[in-house]
């Protein structure tokens, strides 16, 4: 950082940092537009429909048309609502969803803030996301949004515990909380990815990591309020939950924040278990030109994110919604004991194993 400031000056360094953040945000939002289209196309295909196919070739511009539709609608604040909190809630959700991405590396060196405690920062920021939903549900001054907000708070807190323990198992193996180092540890081919790796300890690593990857993926569905765990916005019970009273741009901000969190969970699944930017073949690209090698890394990272987003979309289309008691039972009585046992097992292996 000191060298960076000495080279460009304080204001020059600040300007470059702002440009990097803006470029990253623009790429992320454009990618999100096409992922939204994919989500709708997958759902339509499962239901034997065509899906969006009018705006642009094959409906490719549908998300951009929806963006302008939301932006140019009137913002209607319900009578009796707390106006300032009502408008602040979607902003909180969106900002927290964006800043969480600051520590996610898309390729070696392609990260806004390469923190040594990146996992801790990410977990802290994602945990704060529930505040936007709670504030929005309470400020709307309506029973359906309030019930949806209460459900969301209980659901996100319940599954954050399991996600936290699963992340601890990965940290014990990696010996680092830096996301780039966790990815680099998995280089050299798919047989070194955490989910498939043997590694030198008393039992094959994949025997623990495969169940942890499955539980992490299911917990990510609950953490992001996606089907079959979309109880906070259940249409058949709460109309649309905490979003009932929102329209126009505030509703758009909620939706973008929600999908940014979904893509983040896809990225975390790829980073923690499936090698991040590492390709499955173990190809050595260190001798390639800088742009070519980093484009190769970025391609594989993006491909893994798209694959897991596709899995999110398929679950949404195929799996019926859980009841609230089933949701809580799954989180507290099944996932929590399994993830806690995995932490104890991996901790014992790290301390008392051949490498301990």
From Swiss-Prot:
Its EC number is 7.1.1.-. It comes from Maricaulis maris (strain MCS10) (Caulobacter maris). Belongs to the complex I subunit 1 family. NDH-1 shuttles electrons from NADH, via FMN and iron-sulfur (Fe-S) centers, to quinones in the respiratory chain. The immediate electron acceptor for the enzyme in this species is believed to be ubiquinone. Couples the redox reaction to proton translocation (for every two electrons transferred, four hydrogen ions are translocated across the cytoplasmic membrane), and thus conserves the redox energy in a proton gradient. This subunit may bind ubiquinone. Coiled coil: none annotated. GO terms for molecular function: NADH dehydrogenase activity; oxidoreductase activity, acting on NAD(P)H, quinone or similar compound as acceptor; quinone binding. It is found in: Cell inner membrane. Disulfide bonds: none annotated. The gene is nuoH. The chain crosses the membrane at residues 16-36, 52-72, 85-105, 117-137, 163-183, 201-221, 254-274, 295-315, 334-354. Its main location: membrane. NDH-1 is composed of 14 different subunits. Subunits NuoA, H, J, K, L, M, N constitute the membrane sector of the complex. One of its GO terms (biological process) is aerobic respiration. Keywords: Cell inner membrane, Cell membrane, Membrane, NAD, Quinone, Translocase, Transmembrane, Transmembrane helix, Ubiquinone. This is NADH-quinone oxidoreductase subunit H. NCBIfam families: PRK06076.1-6. It holds the Pfam family NADHdh. The keyword Glycoprotein does not apply. PROSITE patterns: COMPLEX1_ND1_2. One of its GO terms (cellular component) is plasma membrane. It is a multi-pass membrane protein.
């Amino acid at each position: 950082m000191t060298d960076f400031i000495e080279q460009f000056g304080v204001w020059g360094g600040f300007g470059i940092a702002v440009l990097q953040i803006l470029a990253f945000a623009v790429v992320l939002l454009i990618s999100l537009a096409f992922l939204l289209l994919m989500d709708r196309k997958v759902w339509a295909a499962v239901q034997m429909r065509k899906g969006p196919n009018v705006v642009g070739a094959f409906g490719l511009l549908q998300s951009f048309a929806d963006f302008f539709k939301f932006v140019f609608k009137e913002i209607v604040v319900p009578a009796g609502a707390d106006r300032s909190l009502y408008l602040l809630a979607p902003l909180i959700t969106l900002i927290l969803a964006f800043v969480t991405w600051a520590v996610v590396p898309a390729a070696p060196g392609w990260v806004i803030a390469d923190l040594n405690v990146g996992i801790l920062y990410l977990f802290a920021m994602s945990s704060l996301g529930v505040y936007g939903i709670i504030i929005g549900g309470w400020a709307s001054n309506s029973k359906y949004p309030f019930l949806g907000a209460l459900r969301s708070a209980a659901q996100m807190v319940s599954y954050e515990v399991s996600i936290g323990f699963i992340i601890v198992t990965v940290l014990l193996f990696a010996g680092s909380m830096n996301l780039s180092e966790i990815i680099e540890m998995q280089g050299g081919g798919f047989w070194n990815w955490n989910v498939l790796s043997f590694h030198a300890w008393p039992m094959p690593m994949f025997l623990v990591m495969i169940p942890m990857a499955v539980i992490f993926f299911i917990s990510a569905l609950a953490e992001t309020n996606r089907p079959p765990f979309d109880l906070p916005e259940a249409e058949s019970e709460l109309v649309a939950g905490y979003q009932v009273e929102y329209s126009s741009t505030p509703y758009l901000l909620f939706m973008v924040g929600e999908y940014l969190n979904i893509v983040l969970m896809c990225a975390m699944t790829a980073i923690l278990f499936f090698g991040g930017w590492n390709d499955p073949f173990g190809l050595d690209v260190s001798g390639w030109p800088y742009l070519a090698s980093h484009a190769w890394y970025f391609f594989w990272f993006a491909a893994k994110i798209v694959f897991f987003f596709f899995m999110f979309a398929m679950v949404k289309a195929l799996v019926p919604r859980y009841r609230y008691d089933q949701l809580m039972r799954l989180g507290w009585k099944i996932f929590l004991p399994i993830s806690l046992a995995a932490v104890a097992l991996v901790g014992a292996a790290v301390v008392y194993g051949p490498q301990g």
